[in-house]
Structure formats: C-alpha cells, structure tokens
Design a protein with these regions (language model features):
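Aromatic-glycine hotspot motif
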Residues: 1-47, 54-133
Length: 133
C-alpha cells in the first residue's frame, strides 16, 4: 500500500508540474492588455485566474499545516473569490476593475506557491518511502 501511495505522489507531482507549465505557456502567449481585461462579468481576467489558482493551492497547503511565509508584497488575500470563511470576497464582476495583482506579482506569487506545493508533495513522498523500511 505504501508503494502505491509513493507512486501516486510521484505521479501527482509530475502532473502538477506539467499542468502548471502548460498553463504558463498558454498565459505567456497573451499580451499584457489581453491578460488583464475582463471580457464579461461572469469570467475573470486571465491574470486574476493565474493568481487565484495559486491562492487556492496556498489555502490547501495551509489546511494541511504548511506554514507559508509570504513576503509582504505577496499578501494577496484579496484573491479569495468564493470562500467566505477566509476573508473579504471581491465579486467576479469587479475583478477586471481592480488593477491588482500585477502580472509580475501574479507570476512571482505563482512561482513561490508552486515551489511550496512541490516541496509538500516531495516531503509526503519521502515520508512514504521511509515507511517502506
């Protein structure tokens, strides 16, 4: 059973990295103006989406006891869009009117959180491996 979990965590880590890489490749094709515009009230700007998904991963890590020390300039709590228990919610129609996060902030934040997620998965994987002996 431990080997199955070990293999699953390795596979999950690879899939996470691949998905995040592909998403970034798609995002990198956008011009700045295209990344921050909100075409309709029911859809978020691509830049917002890029940062919000990272915020979601951050919250999932914290739920599992990971202490994340973000640099002050990366305090992106306003990316909460659904979860009232976390804090203030910026409504979907307003996201395109809110000039933050900048694309640079989104990419830095995303990179920071990606490293945290991969570290978390590797730690879990190492713990599974230790259980084999």
């Amino acid at each position: 059973m431990t080997q199955v979990l070990h293999d699953s965590l390795e596979s999950l880590t690879k899939e996470f990295k691949s998905t995040r890489r592909i998403t970034l490749e798609i995002f990198s094709q956008l011009r700045h103006e295209d990344a921050v515009i909100q075409a309709s009230d029911f859809g978020s700007p691509p830049n917002w989406h890029l940062a919000h998904v990272s915020w979601f991963f951050q919250k999932m890590l914290e739920k599992h006891g990971v202490k994340i020390s973000l640099p002050k300039e990366m305090n992106l709590a306003y990316l909460n869009s659904y979860y009232q228990k976390y804090d203030f919610i910026l409504s979907k129609p307003q996201r395109g009117r809110f000039p933050r996060p900048t694309i640079r902030q989104s990419l830095q934040y995303r990179s920071f959180i990606d490293k945290e997620v991969v570290g978390f998965l590797k730690q879990r994987n190492a713990n599974c491996h230790d259980d084999l002996y």
